[in-house]
Amino acid sequence: MADRKLERTTRPRPRRLLRALLRATALAVVLLVLASGVGFAYESNAARADAREHPAPGRLVDVGGHRLHLYCTGSGSPTVVLEAGLAESSASWEVIQRRLSARSRVCSYDRAGYAWSQEGPSPRTAERLAGELHALLTASGEAGPYVMVAHSFGGNVVRVFADRWRSLTAGLVLVDVTDETALTALRISQPLLAVQLSVNQFVARVGLLRLRGDALVPPEATPFARANATVVYGSGSMAAARAEAWASVDSATQVAATVRPHAWGDLPVTVIRPAGQSEEDSAHARSLAALSSRGRLVTATTTEHYVQNAQPDLVLDEIARVAAG
Protein backbone atom coordinates (compact mmCIF):
# COMPACT_ATOMS: atom_id res chain seq x y z
CA MET A 1 0.00 0.00 0.00
CA ALA A 2 2.81 2.36 0.91
CA ASP A 3 4.62 1.47 -2.30
CA ARG A 4 1.54 2.41 -4.35
CA LYS A 5 1.23 5.71 -2.49
CA LEU A 6 4.91 6.43 -3.14
CA GLU A 7 4.45 5.55 -6.80
CA ARG A 8 1.53 7.98 -7.10
CA THR A 9 3.49 10.82 -5.52
CA THR A 10 6.67 10.28 -7.54
CA ARG A 11 5.15 9.43 -10.93
CA PRO A 12 5.53 12.39 -13.34
CA ARG A 13 2.23 13.98 -14.19
CA PRO A 14 1.75 14.48 -17.96
CA ARG A 15 0.00 17.83 -17.56
CA ARG A 16 2.75 19.15 -15.33
CA LEU A 17 5.41 18.01 -17.81
CA LEU A 18 3.50 19.58 -20.68
CA ARG A 19 3.19 22.90 -18.83
CA ALA A 20 6.92 22.84 -18.06
CA LEU A 21 7.74 22.08 -21.68
CA LEU A 22 5.50 24.89 -22.91
CA ARG A 23 7.08 27.34 -20.46
CA ALA A 24 10.57 26.32 -21.59
CA THR A 25 9.59 26.63 -25.25
CA ALA A 26 7.99 30.03 -24.70
CA LEU A 27 11.09 31.22 -22.86
CA ALA A 28 13.31 30.00 -25.70
CA VAL A 29 11.15 31.81 -28.26
CA VAL A 30 11.22 35.02 -26.23
CA LEU A 31 15.00 34.83 -25.87
CA LEU A 32 15.38 34.13 -29.60
CA VAL A 33 13.16 37.10 -30.49
CA LEU A 34 15.04 39.37 -28.11
CA ALA A 35 18.40 38.19 -29.42
CA SER A 36 17.23 38.60 -33.01
CA GLY A 37 15.90 42.07 -32.24
CA VAL A 38 19.19 43.11 -30.71
CA GLY A 39 21.07 41.59 -33.63
CA PHE A 40 18.76 43.26 -36.14
CA ALA A 41 19.29 46.67 -34.53
CA TYR A 42 23.04 46.09 -34.39
CA GLU A 43 23.16 45.05 -38.04
CA SER A 44 20.99 47.99 -39.16
CA ASN A 45 23.27 50.49 -37.45
CA ALA A 46 26.41 48.81 -38.73
CA ALA A 47 25.05 48.55 -42.28
CA ARG A 48 24.68 52.33 -42.44
CA ALA A 49 28.40 52.63 -41.86
CA ASP A 50 29.21 50.27 -44.75
CA ALA A 51 28.71 53.00 -47.35
CA ARG A 52 31.56 54.93 -45.72
CA GLU A 53 33.82 52.02 -44.80
CA HIS A 54 33.21 49.89 -47.90
CA PRO A 55 32.41 52.26 -50.78
CA ALA A 56 31.51 50.86 -54.17
CA PRO A 57 34.56 50.73 -56.46
CA GLY A 58 32.41 51.63 -59.47
CA ARG A 59 29.27 53.67 -60.10
CA LEU A 60 25.54 53.12 -59.71
CA VAL A 61 23.53 53.19 -62.94
CA ASP A 62 19.75 53.49 -63.13
CA VAL A 63 18.18 50.67 -65.14
CA GLY A 64 14.57 51.75 -64.71
CA GLY A 65 13.40 51.77 -61.11
CA HIS A 66 16.57 50.54 -59.43
CA ARG A 67 20.31 51.09 -59.73
CA LEU A 68 23.01 48.54 -60.46
CA HIS A 69 26.68 48.79 -59.54
CA LEU A 70 28.98 48.80 -62.58
CA TYR A 71 32.77 48.76 -62.30
CA CYS A 72 34.74 49.36 -65.51
CA THR A 73 38.52 49.64 -65.85
CA GLY A 74 41.11 49.73 -68.61
CA SER A 75 40.69 50.61 -72.26
CA GLY A 76 40.47 48.85 -75.57
CA SER A 77 37.96 47.08 -77.75
CA PRO A 78 35.94 44.89 -77.55
CA THR A 79 34.80 45.50 -73.99
CA VAL A 80 34.84 42.41 -71.78
CA VAL A 81 31.84 41.93 -69.47
CA LEU A 82 32.23 39.66 -66.44
CA GLU A 83 29.18 37.81 -65.09
CA ALA A 84 29.32 36.23 -61.61
CA GLY A 85 27.77 33.01 -60.33
CA LEU A 86 24.97 32.48 -57.82
CA ALA A 87 25.56 34.22 -54.45
CA GLU A 88 28.57 35.99 -55.97
CA SER A 89 29.23 39.52 -57.20
CA SER A 90 31.70 41.62 -59.15
CA ALA A 91 34.19 40.92 -56.35
CA SER A 92 34.54 37.31 -57.52
CA TRP A 93 36.28 38.59 -60.67
CA GLU A 94 38.83 40.76 -58.85
CA VAL A 95 41.93 38.88 -60.04
CA ILE A 96 40.79 38.62 -63.66
CA GLN A 97 39.65 42.25 -63.88
CA ARG A 98 42.82 43.66 -62.33
CA ARG A 99 45.07 41.80 -64.75
CA LEU A 100 42.85 42.09 -67.82
CA SER A 101 42.40 45.86 -67.50
CA ALA A 102 46.08 46.34 -68.36
CA ARG A 103 45.20 45.59 -71.99
CA SER A 104 41.41 45.68 -72.33
CA ARG A 105 38.29 47.56 -71.33
CA VAL A 106 36.65 45.29 -68.76
CA CYS A 107 33.43 45.68 -66.77
CA SER A 108 32.11 43.70 -63.84
CA TYR A 109 28.81 44.40 -62.14
CA ASP A 110 26.52 43.28 -59.34
CA ARG A 111 23.14 41.85 -60.26
CA ALA A 112 20.18 43.44 -58.46
CA GLY A 113 20.37 43.01 -54.69
CA TYR A 114 23.99 41.87 -54.62
CA ALA A 115 26.77 43.85 -52.93
CA TRP A 116 26.37 47.51 -53.95
CA SER A 117 23.37 47.10 -56.28
CA GLN A 118 19.80 47.88 -55.29
CA GLU A 119 17.10 45.22 -55.10
CA GLY A 120 15.23 44.52 -58.33
CA PRO A 121 11.74 43.26 -59.25
CA SER A 122 10.75 39.59 -59.24
CA PRO A 123 10.88 36.96 -60.56
CA ARG A 124 14.66 36.87 -60.89
CA THR A 125 14.78 34.71 -63.99
CA ALA A 126 17.53 34.52 -66.60
CA GLU A 127 15.44 36.56 -69.04
CA ARG A 128 14.95 39.36 -66.51
CA LEU A 129 18.61 39.32 -65.51
CA ALA A 130 19.75 39.46 -69.14
CA GLY A 131 17.35 42.34 -69.77
CA GLU A 132 18.75 44.26 -66.81
CA LEU A 133 22.30 43.65 -68.03
CA HIS A 134 21.37 45.03 -71.44
CA ALA A 135 19.72 48.06 -69.82
CA LEU A 136 22.82 48.59 -67.66
CA LEU A 137 25.26 48.52 -70.56
CA THR A 138 23.03 50.79 -72.64
CA ALA A 139 22.48 53.35 -69.87
CA SER A 140 26.15 53.36 -68.90
CA GLY A 141 27.36 54.26 -72.37
CA GLU A 142 29.71 51.28 -72.51
CA ALA A 143 29.76 50.50 -76.22
CA GLY A 144 29.43 47.01 -77.63
CA PRO A 145 29.85 44.49 -78.98
CA TYR A 146 30.99 42.70 -75.82
CA VAL A 147 32.94 39.59 -74.99
CA MET A 148 30.71 38.00 -72.37
CA VAL A 149 32.57 36.00 -69.71
CA ALA A 150 30.48 34.01 -67.26
CA HIS A 151 31.02 31.70 -64.32
CA SER A 152 28.58 29.04 -63.09
CA PHE A 153 24.99 30.39 -62.83
CA GLY A 154 26.12 33.50 -64.70
CA GLY A 155 26.18 31.35 -67.83
CA ASN A 156 22.38 31.46 -67.85
CA VAL A 157 22.44 35.25 -68.05
CA VAL A 158 24.97 35.64 -70.85
CA ARG A 159 23.48 32.82 -72.91
CA VAL A 160 20.08 34.52 -72.92
CA PHE A 161 21.82 37.85 -73.62
CA ALA A 162 23.71 36.37 -76.59
CA ASP A 163 20.52 34.85 -77.98
CA ARG A 164 18.51 38.07 -77.68
CA TRP A 165 21.25 40.57 -78.59
CA ARG A 166 23.45 38.62 -80.97
CA SER A 167 24.76 41.79 -82.66
CA LEU A 168 26.06 43.03 -79.30
CA THR A 169 27.90 39.79 -78.57
CA ALA A 170 31.47 39.54 -79.85
CA GLY A 171 32.17 36.22 -78.18
CA LEU A 172 31.59 33.99 -75.17
CA VAL A 173 33.87 32.52 -72.51
CA LEU A 174 31.91 30.12 -70.29
CA VAL A 175 33.66 28.97 -67.12
CA ASP A 176 32.13 25.80 -65.61
CA VAL A 177 28.63 27.10 -66.28
CA THR A 178 25.36 25.65 -65.03
CA ASP A 179 23.78 22.74 -66.91
CA GLU A 180 20.30 23.84 -67.96
CA THR A 181 19.33 20.28 -68.94
CA ALA A 182 19.55 18.86 -65.40
CA LEU A 183 15.98 19.86 -64.56
CA THR A 184 15.18 16.84 -62.38
CA ALA A 185 18.14 17.48 -60.10
CA LEU A 186 17.39 21.20 -60.18
CA ARG A 187 13.78 20.70 -59.07
CA ILE A 188 15.04 18.69 -56.08
CA SER A 189 17.84 21.06 -55.12
CA GLN A 190 15.95 24.32 -55.75
CA PRO A 191 13.95 24.41 -52.47
CA LEU A 192 16.89 23.06 -50.46
CA LEU A 193 19.21 25.74 -51.82
CA ALA A 194 16.60 28.42 -51.19
CA VAL A 195 16.27 27.30 -47.56
CA GLN A 196 20.04 27.35 -47.11
CA LEU A 197 20.23 30.85 -48.55
CA SER A 198 17.36 31.95 -46.30
CA VAL A 199 19.36 30.78 -43.29
CA ASN A 200 22.41 32.63 -44.61
CA GLN A 201 20.29 35.75 -45.03
CA PHE A 202 19.08 35.48 -41.41
CA VAL A 203 22.64 34.98 -40.16
CA ALA A 204 23.72 38.13 -41.98
CA ARG A 205 20.59 40.11 -41.05
CA VAL A 206 21.01 39.66 -37.29
CA GLY A 207 24.67 40.64 -37.36
CA LEU A 208 26.31 37.23 -36.97
CA LEU A 209 28.37 37.79 -40.12
CA ARG A 210 29.96 40.85 -38.53
CA LEU A 211 30.68 38.99 -35.31
CA ARG A 212 32.36 36.25 -37.30
CA GLY A 213 33.49 37.81 -40.51
CA ASP A 214 34.14 34.56 -42.38
CA ALA A 215 30.80 32.91 -41.57
CA LEU A 216 29.39 33.16 -45.10
CA VAL A 217 32.61 33.73 -47.03
CA PRO A 218 33.48 30.81 -49.34
CA PRO A 219 37.05 29.49 -49.31
CA GLU A 220 37.48 30.63 -52.93
CA ALA A 221 36.67 34.28 -52.16
CA THR A 222 39.10 36.87 -53.51
CA PRO A 223 41.00 39.17 -51.13
CA PHE A 224 38.77 42.09 -52.14
CA ALA A 225 35.64 40.06 -51.40
CA ARG A 226 36.99 39.13 -47.97
CA ALA A 227 37.88 42.73 -47.17
CA ASN A 228 34.32 43.78 -48.03
CA ALA A 229 32.54 40.65 -46.77
CA THR A 230 29.77 42.47 -44.90
CA VAL A 231 28.66 44.05 -48.18
CA VAL A 232 29.56 41.31 -50.64
CA TYR A 233 28.05 38.48 -48.58
CA GLY A 234 25.55 40.52 -46.55
CA SER A 235 21.83 39.96 -46.11
CA GLY A 236 21.00 41.77 -49.36
CA SER A 237 23.23 39.45 -51.36
CA MET A 238 21.78 36.38 -49.67
CA ALA A 239 18.23 37.59 -50.38
CA ALA A 240 19.16 38.15 -54.03
CA ALA A 241 20.69 34.68 -54.27
CA ARG A 242 17.60 33.13 -52.71
CA ALA A 243 15.35 34.90 -55.24
CA GLU A 244 17.49 33.63 -58.12
CA ALA A 245 17.50 30.12 -56.65
CA TRP A 246 13.69 30.08 -56.43
CA ALA A 247 13.54 31.04 -60.12
CA SER A 248 16.29 28.62 -61.20
CA VAL A 249 13.98 26.07 -62.84
CA ASP A 250 12.31 28.80 -64.91
CA SER A 251 15.75 30.18 -65.77
CA ALA A 252 16.95 26.78 -66.94
CA THR A 253 13.84 26.41 -69.10
CA GLN A 254 14.46 29.83 -70.66
CA VAL A 255 18.08 28.97 -71.40
CA ALA A 256 17.11 25.59 -72.88
CA ALA A 257 14.79 27.42 -75.29
CA THR A 258 17.82 29.15 -76.84
CA VAL A 259 19.51 25.84 -77.72
CA ARG A 260 19.25 24.81 -81.36
CA PRO A 261 21.75 23.49 -83.92
CA HIS A 262 24.43 26.10 -84.72
CA ALA A 263 22.67 28.59 -82.41
CA TRP A 264 25.85 30.65 -82.11
CA GLY A 265 26.85 30.46 -85.78
CA ASP A 266 30.54 31.33 -86.13
CA LEU A 267 30.73 33.27 -82.84
CA PRO A 268 34.08 32.79 -81.06
CA VAL A 269 33.27 30.63 -78.03
CA THR A 270 35.40 28.96 -75.38
CA VAL A 271 33.91 26.56 -72.85
CA ILE A 272 36.20 25.95 -69.88
CA ARG A 273 35.61 22.95 -67.66
CA PRO A 274 37.54 21.87 -64.55
CA ALA A 275 39.33 18.54 -64.44
CA GLY A 276 37.56 15.53 -62.96
CA GLN A 277 34.07 16.38 -64.20
CA SER A 278 31.40 13.70 -64.40
CA GLU A 279 30.61 12.33 -67.84
CA GLU A 280 27.26 14.12 -67.72
CA ASP A 281 28.91 17.49 -67.05
CA SER A 282 31.56 16.83 -69.69
CA ALA A 283 28.87 15.99 -72.25
CA HIS A 284 27.12 19.28 -71.48
CA ALA A 285 30.37 21.22 -71.93
CA ARG A 286 30.98 19.52 -75.30
CA SER A 287 27.44 20.29 -76.43
CA LEU A 288 27.90 23.98 -75.61
CA ALA A 289 31.11 24.23 -77.62
CA ALA A 290 29.33 22.54 -80.54
CA LEU A 291 26.75 25.35 -80.75
CA SER A 292 29.36 27.41 -82.63
CA SER A 293 31.47 26.44 -85.62
CA ARG A 294 34.29 28.19 -83.76
CA GLY A 295 33.52 26.63 -80.41
CA ARG A 296 36.46 25.50 -78.33
CA LEU A 297 36.44 23.17 -75.31
CA VAL A 298 39.27 23.62 -72.80
CA THR A 299 39.90 21.42 -69.77
CA ALA A 300 41.66 23.04 -66.82
CA THR A 301 44.13 21.13 -64.68
CA THR A 302 42.38 22.27 -61.50
CA THR A 303 39.33 20.49 -60.13
CA GLU A 304 38.11 23.71 -58.49
CA HIS A 305 34.79 25.22 -59.54
CA TYR A 306 36.29 28.75 -59.42
CA VAL A 307 38.68 28.15 -62.30
CA GLN A 308 39.20 31.90 -62.70
CA ASN A 309 40.85 32.03 -59.28
CA ALA A 310 42.68 28.70 -59.40
CA GLN A 311 44.00 29.17 -62.97
CA PRO A 312 43.65 32.85 -63.91
CA ASP A 313 46.23 32.59 -66.72
CA LEU A 314 44.11 29.99 -68.50
CA VAL A 315 40.98 32.13 -68.31
CA LEU A 316 42.87 35.27 -69.36
CA ASP A 317 44.37 33.48 -72.37
CA GLU A 318 40.95 32.30 -73.52
CA ILE A 319 39.43 35.76 -73.09
CA ALA A 320 42.24 37.19 -75.23
CA ARG A 321 41.71 34.49 -77.86
CA VAL A 322 37.97 35.19 -78.10
CA ALA A 323 38.46 38.98 -78.06
CA ALA A 324 40.88 38.68 -80.99
CA GLY A 325 38.03 37.19 -83.00
Question: What are the language-model segments listed below?
Answer:
Residues 223-299:
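Conserved serine/cysteine hydrolase catalytic core
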Residues 111-147:
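Active-site loop/oxyanion-hole signature of alpha/beta-hydrolase fold enzymes
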Residues 144-186:
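Conserved hydrolase catalytic core segment
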Residues 66, 72-116:
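Conserved HGGG/HGGXW glycine-rich cap/lid loop of the alpha/beta-hydrolase fold
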Residues 173-205:
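Flexible "cap/lid" loop of the alpha/beta hydrolase fold
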Residues 293-325:
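Catalytic active-site module of serine/aspartate enzymes centered on a nucleophile-bearing elbow/loop
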Residues 2-78, 102-104, 324-325:
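Alpha/beta-hydrolase fold catalytic core
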Residues 110-115, 178, 301-304:
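Short beta-to-alpha linker loops that shape the active-site pocket of alpha/beta-hydrolase fold enzymes
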